[in-house]
Structures are given as C-alpha cells and as structure tokens.
C-alpha cells in the first residue's frame, strides 16, 4: 500500500527571504516603539552585499532605517566579510514614502476599516502540544535548532532549510516520520562527514526526541545532500520580504489567502486577521470542540466588519460548523480595531516572528487559549 505522506518545509532566519522579512519587521518595531499608530508597509530586498528598503511609512517616529537594518543583519549572524554579505560593509539604500491618503482615509481610527480586501486563514489541530500540524512543527523546530547552532559554532553560517515528510493512516492519524531533509550553509573548513554527523546528532535527533520520535525510526535522512553549501545567504540567492508565506503559516497543511505578514502594521488584515484566525482556531481545538479546525475570514477595503467568517472542522466538531461559527461571532470582535485591541498589536513585537515563527510559539498573544473555557461553556448551552 502506498504511504500517505504530507511534507512541509521551513527555513532559518538566515535564508535570504527571511533576512528581508527580519529587516522589514525590525523597521516596523522601531516605528511602533516610538509611535504605536505608525502605518508601515515595508519591503526589503537583499542580494550580494546590497540591501534595498522601500515601501510606505507614515509615522511620527524618527528611525535610522539603515542602522536598524544593519543591526538586524548582525543579529542573524552575517558578520563574516568573506561571505559576500555582512552587516558592516553591506550597501543600504532606502526608498520610503508615506501611506496613500486614500487608504488612510478608510482605515483611520474613526472608520476603522480594513486596510485591504482579501481572505485569511487560521488553523489548529491536535497533532502537537502547540496545536500545529506535525510536519510544519517539526520543520520549524529543526530550523530554530539550526539557528541556535549557528550562534554557537563558528563553522556554520545562517542560511539553512529543513523539510519533514510525515506518514498518516487513513483516519489522518500520525504513523511516523518518513523523511527529514536538512541543508545548512557552512565554512569551507567544515568537513562534510563531520558536518553531517554534527547535524544528525546535534539537531535532528534531539528535535525528534522532543516530539516523541527516535531518529533510528526515520526511513530517510538527507543532510546537505548536494554536498558543500559554502556560497549562500543573500550572496547565493536574492531575498525578498513576503516570499515565505507557507513557511510562515502551516506548511501547506491549511489554506493560505496569499498575503504576507512581515513589514506590515496591524491595520493590514493580511497580518492581523491571520493572527486572529489562528487564535480562534486554536481556542476551538483547546476547548475540545474539534480536533482539527480551519477558520477563514475575508474583508473589503475600508469596511470594518468581515464580509465572511467560515469554520471547517473537517467532521471532527462536537457541534456543527455553523454553530462553531456562531460561537466565534458572539465572542470575538473581528473588526481591525477589535482585533488590535484583543491581541494588543500596536507594540514592537514583530521582529521575533520573522526569526522564530509566527505560529506555535507560546508567548505570542494569538497563541493564548484564554477564550477556550468561554467557548466550551457557551457550546454546552447551544
């Protein structure tokens, strides 16, 4: 019988696209730290020893954008001049202008409308303690472990990718781990056999163990399968903000509306509505009302209330999807202003999301399960 596999990937914070995300979110945080009402849509491009920062920013904050970018690059670990991209020598150009007055008119405090149209998804399931799908949770844990190793091993470099294939049975239950792929940039002085042993024993084995799996049970493990990975980071590939939207969410396990997160202030529903959708889905699962849930929201630009809200429990709900939807409508203010208030989003909290992930991280406000007891009690009264 053919295996039922699902695969998700992740990247480290030194991947070129994630470098761009980190710079954009660092600039967002710098603006919000001084002016919580900053309107920010910051896009970044990085390539060989060059960084372009552009976009629309309306703020009373005084921010040295190049300095913020250099610090973000330095924090990631690009500090070696010979690698073709480093914090001290990278050329940085800025092309920033203010937000369109037409957009601002429909999203100001009096109107509180959405900053754009679009649909956003949030999901949760019982496959992991953090209520995330196992393939993306493992991929994320592996990439975060790689990042830790980069900062403790001078022979490793920040650019890396991970990928995990999980086997499921016909009922959708996890059977085991079929394949793990890890690629990490490194110094030319790191012998390949030593690197592979280091990654197998110091990265893959402990992460699998944390999730209850033995590395010996994995059918296929590929570590730097093409061999040397010395040329990497922005010197190897150009990076752009918002190009890792599947990595940033659920690894393809749940749907995606297409909007990116990084560099956007919370009036942009691409970000804030995706966060509240995750919050609602996670709380439904935490309340025991379903074992797997996807929530969809959709908005029209300048309109405060969502044009649609839909819950899909994949047949696992203890009450109907329509009743689950009704519970959410009664308990959560889904206007942009309401989302911002509930999750307290006008704060400089975004740079860590570009580094360690948006979902499945316990201290994120949208990861809290404070709504679960309320939903559980209300469900008993329906």
Identify what each model region corresponds to.
Residues 9-11, 15-20, 113-127, 230-254, ...:
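Conserved phosphate/anionic-ligand binding catalytic regions in large, soluble enzymes, centered on
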Residues 7, 67, 74-231, 360-375:
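Glycine-rich, mobile lid/loop segments that gate access to catalytic sites or pores
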Residues 13-32, 127-144, 264-288:
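Alpha-helical support elements that line or immediately flank enzyme active sites
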Residues 47, 292, 299-382:
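Internal helix-turn-beta structural module
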Residues 191-284:
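Glycine-rich anion/phosphate-binding loop at the beta-strand->alpha-helix junction
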Residues 38-42, 160-166, 219-223, 289-300:
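A short glycine-rich, hydrophobically flanked beta-strand micro-motif that places a catalytic Asp/Glu
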Residues 41-59, 301-305:
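Short, charge-patterned binding micro-sites
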Residues 1-41, 374:
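N-terminal, positively charged regions that mediate nucleic acid binding
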């Amino acid at each position: 019988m053919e295996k039922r596999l699902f695969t998700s990937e992740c990247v480290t914070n030194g991947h070129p696209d994630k470098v761009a995300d980190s710079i954009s979110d660092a600039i967002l945080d710098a603006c919000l730290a001084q002016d919580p009402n900053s309107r920010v849509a910051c896009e970044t491009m990085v390539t060989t020893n060059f960084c372009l920062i552009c976009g629309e920013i309306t703020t009373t904050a005084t921010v040295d954008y190049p300095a913020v970018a250099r610090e973000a690059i330095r924090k990631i670990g690009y500090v070696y001049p010979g690698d073709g991209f480093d914090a001290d020598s990278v050329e940085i150009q800025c092309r920033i202008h203010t937000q369109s007055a037409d957009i601002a008119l429909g999203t100001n405090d009096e109107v509180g409308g959405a900053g754009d149209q679009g649909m956003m998804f949030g999901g949760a399931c019982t496959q992991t303690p953090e209520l995330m799908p196992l393939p993306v949770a493992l991929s994320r844990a592996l990439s975060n472990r790689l990042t830790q190793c980069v900062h403790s091993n001078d022979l490793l470099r920040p650019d890396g990718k991970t990928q995990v294939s999980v086997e499921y049975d016909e009922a959708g239950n996890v059977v085991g781990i079929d394949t793990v792929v890890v690629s990490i940039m490194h110094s030319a002085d790191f012998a390949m056999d030593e690197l592979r042993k280091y990654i197998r024993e110091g990265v893959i084995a402990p992460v699998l163990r944390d999730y209850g799996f033995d590395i010996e049970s994995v059918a296929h493990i590929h570590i730097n399968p093409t061999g040397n990975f010395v040329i990497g980071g922005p010197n190897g590939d150009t990076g752009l903000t918002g190009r890792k939207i599947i990595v940033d969410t659920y690894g393809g396990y749940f749907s995606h509306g297409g909007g990116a997160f990084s560099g956007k202030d919370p009036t942009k529903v691409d970000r804030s509505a995706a966060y509240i959708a995750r919050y609602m889905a996670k709380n439904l699962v935490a309340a025991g009302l379903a074992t797997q849930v996807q929530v969809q929201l959709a908005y029209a630009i300048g309109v405060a209330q969502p044009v649609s809200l839909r819950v899909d429990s994949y047949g696992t709900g203890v009450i109907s999807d329509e009743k689950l939807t009704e519970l959410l409508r009664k308990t959560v203010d889904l206007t942009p202003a309401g989302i911002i208030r509930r999750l307290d989003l006008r704060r400089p909290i975004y740079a860590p999301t570009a580094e360690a992930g948006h979902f499945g991280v316990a201290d994120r406000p949208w990861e809290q399960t404070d709504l679960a007891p309320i939903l559980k009690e209300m469900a008993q009264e329906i």
